[in-house]
Amino acid sequence: MELSYQTLKLTHQAREAYEMRTEARRKNLLILILHYLTQEGYMDAAKALEEETKLGLRRFEVCDNVDLETILMEYESYYFVKFQKYPKVVKKAPDPVENNLPSRSGGKNKRLTNDSCQNLPKICHQKSRPKTSAVKTGDTKSVKEHLKQVKESVTDTQAESTDFGLNISKIHKDQPEEKAQPRRGQIIDFRGLLSDAIKGATSEFALNTFECNPDPSERLLKPLSAFIGMNSEMRELAAVVSRDIYLHNPNIKWNDIIGLDAAKQLVKEAVVYPIRYPQLFTGILSPWKGLLLYGPPGTGKTLLAKAVATECKTTFFNISASTIVSKWRGDSEKLVRVLFELARYHAPSTIFLDELESVMSQRGMVPGGEHEGSLRMKTELLVQMDGLARSEDLVFVLAASNLPWELDCAMLRRLEKRILVDLPSQEARQAMIYHWLPPVSKNHALELHTQLEYSVLSQETEGYSGSDIKLVCREAAMRPVRKIFSVLENNQSESNNLPGIQLDTVTTQDFLDVLAHTKPSAKNLTERYLAWQEKFESV
């Protein structure tokens, strides 16, 4: 099929609408089950369900005249009207003990379960048996005519009933047959139908308790009980790693990040676009599996990760050194393996490794030799990342480091894209100052006015990182507030005749005074980052 912009867009919207409906249906089922368990008094089971889903189901309640029992009764009534019999919802298990055990191949005695009979062909039972006793022996003509009648009766009997409960009558040849008229092909607007379906699904989803863009805290994770292939020890480690799945909403959008256009574009190419347009990312165009953000502290590396957690519909693992480093022998490499297995299990997912140099420093550089446990953990991490590169799982590793020259060379090879998140430019600094100190800013009951020359201040803040500029703006806004404290503390009388609070205007000179006492945190490291970029850059 020929690809076009409209086809890709409509395909993405249809897939997104289907996923939204499926997600809403699963959540509604869980809420219905929780409501039924609570109403029937199964409090322990309801508590276990709420803990395993980690959704906070108590925040929602079932609408009026809706419950699980009513839905089942309505289904039974519908089934009876359609098929003239009640549905069989449950059946007795042949052997519950043996069904839970893994099946072994090569055994002599094998039981045939009901699942193995599902693919057998259905036998069409005839309603009435054709009469054959009226045929006289030796009458060849009558036998042929009777066999023809039997064949027609069997055909009619088989066509009378279908698996869908429909009665079909045969059209006999003696009826007058209309002359077949040639019909022109009907023009069907598939694009319009698809667009209407998408709009209907989206509006239905929005009206059905949940919003179109749910928070990460409302994301329905797969239960760990379905995590196949792990023993009890691995299940415990999986529970430890699952605590670092980011289920909070940082509320950081792409537009909230000033600058960093190249980094945002590459993150979108690796995480967002492969999910939206999978047709484009095949073969040599497979998405990136690893991306390294390096640069001075306070330039927005972690902010990019928060934007990924907010904007991208992936399971976000926020991993630090304390997550995968253990004092027990062999547990560190097991934690690394479980981390990547969980990421594949919850795919599409993103693994964010902050302060990567604390985990993947260069091997063989420690005087006296590196600890054996640390070497095993690093080796396992490299092996797992190699497995990601060879697989088609939508698992992406996003790493951040302030000291990229301390990273192991093998890790650099696996991080395909390496982007320098440098100090903000003059335009970015001016936009940051305007964002934090606009001409009029109202914070609850206080209203702060400023008279700043933003272009002059952006030149004076050269060498400051984004966090440094935020600190300077906060200190400049705090100066007029300090005068309020002196008025409140010096007035010891019990009378309420205090003047109304009015903050002084923050001027350019106030900002420059704050700059004189607030120095940049990483100005001296700029040349070293640029030198490392010339050797190891990969954009």
UniProtKB/Swiss-Prot annotation:
Single Gene Ontology MF annotation: ATP hydrolysis activity
InterPro entries (alphabetical): AAA+_ATPase, AAA_lid_3, ATPase_AAA_core, Katanin_p60_AL2, LisH, MT-severing_AAA_ATPase, P-loop_NTPase
Catalytic activity: n ATP + n H2O + a microtubule = n ADP + n phosphate + (n+1) alpha/beta tubulin heterodimers
Gene: Katnal2
Family recorded in the similarity comment: Belongs to the AAA ATPase family. Katanin p60 subunit A1 subfamily. A-like 2 sub-subfamily.
Region (Disordered): 93-121
Descriptive protein name: Katanin p60 ATPase-containing subunit A-like 2
SUPFAM superfamilies: P-loop containing nucleoside triphosphate hydrolases (SSF52540)
Domain of life: Eukaryota
Keyword Aminoacyl-tRNA synthetase: no
HAMAP family: Katanin_p60_AL2 (MF_03025)
First-tier enzyme category under EC: isomerase
UniProt organism field: Mus musculus (Mouse)
Binding-site residues for ATP, renumbered to this chain: 295-302
EC number(s) stated in the UniProt entry for this protein: 5.6.1.1
Record-linked Pfam families: AAA (PF00004), AAA_lid_3 (PF17862), LisH (PF08513)
